[in-house]
Amino acid sequence: MKILGIGVDIIQNKRIKASIRNHKFKNRIFSSKELKLSSYSKNKIGFFSKRFAAKEAFAKALGTGFRNNLNFKDIEIMNDKLGKPYYAKSKKITNIVRKEFRVKNFNCFLSISDEKEYSTAFAIIETV
């Protein structure tokens, strides 16, 4: 296994707090599954801030940012049954990673955290 990309992002929660009041923003950035999942969260600002940071971190791990027809909604963050966050692999993301790194199989790892004022995310993409 080889690390292909690493990305990290930090965001002030107050920036997301102001933005999530705008439904256009939420619908442009977050998938319908993420929006549905948010309804179960007690801390909406933390929920959206951590996911925003995770999307930015993934784009940085790719090394391309949001280019090549990649947008925020393409990068979907879900949780397993124990609550651990993970990047949901879509066909589009799989194709982008395969093309960018010229690999067939890969894994994505995600760690997210928040504190009162900030949320952060760390992403790793590696070959299998």
Can you say where each PLM-predicted feature lies in the sequence?
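Core catalytic alpha/beta fold that binds nucleotide/phospho-ligands
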Residues: 1-128
